[in-house]
Amino acid sequence: MDKIYDVIIIGSGPAGLSAAIYCARGNLSCMVIEKEVYGGKLSKTYEIDNYPGVGKISGAELAQKYVDQVKSFNIEIITADINRIENLDTCKKLSATNGNSFLARNIIVATGASENRLNLERADEFTGRGISYCAVCDGFFYRK
């Protein structure tokens, strides 16, 4: 916990990872903290074919490309669940449920959003394969 980062980013979806890249390019020391899967909700997306310059790709593959790019800037990405943020004299202290803590001058919260899931038997099994939570995102896949 001795190191004080210029920026700690909570969340590793596209917004969090983009912020990390901009921090690194601005010569700021930064770290990304993700509670679950690197890439956030994107990594759980079945198929993406509207991202310019990439073509058809799974969300997990695109998320891995994001993570690889972030790591190419020597940005540390860790898994932890932050449950407390305290203001100290010169920085902020982030505490995780596993007992670890981190110090940062600035914090970016990029934790995204989650949809209201269907309370149906086997709904998770068919999410992205017939069950969709985004008409704008997935409507293309259901056309004739």
Regions found by a protein language model. Give the residues of each.
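FAD-binding core/adjacent interface of flavoenzyme oxidoreductases
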Residues: 1-10, 77-144
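Conserved acidic E/D residue at the C-terminus of a beta-strand in Rossmann-like folds
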Residues: 32-36
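N-terminal Rossmann-like dinucleotide/flavin-binding domain of flavoprotein oxidoreductases
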Residues: 43-101
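N-terminal Rossmann-like FAD-binding beta1-loop-alpha1 element of flavoenzymes
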Residues: 5-31
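Residue-level detector of alpha-helix initiation sites
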Residues: 13-15, 37, 113-115
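Glycine-rich, phosphate-binding/catalytic loops in enzymes
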Residues: 26, 48-49, 123-127
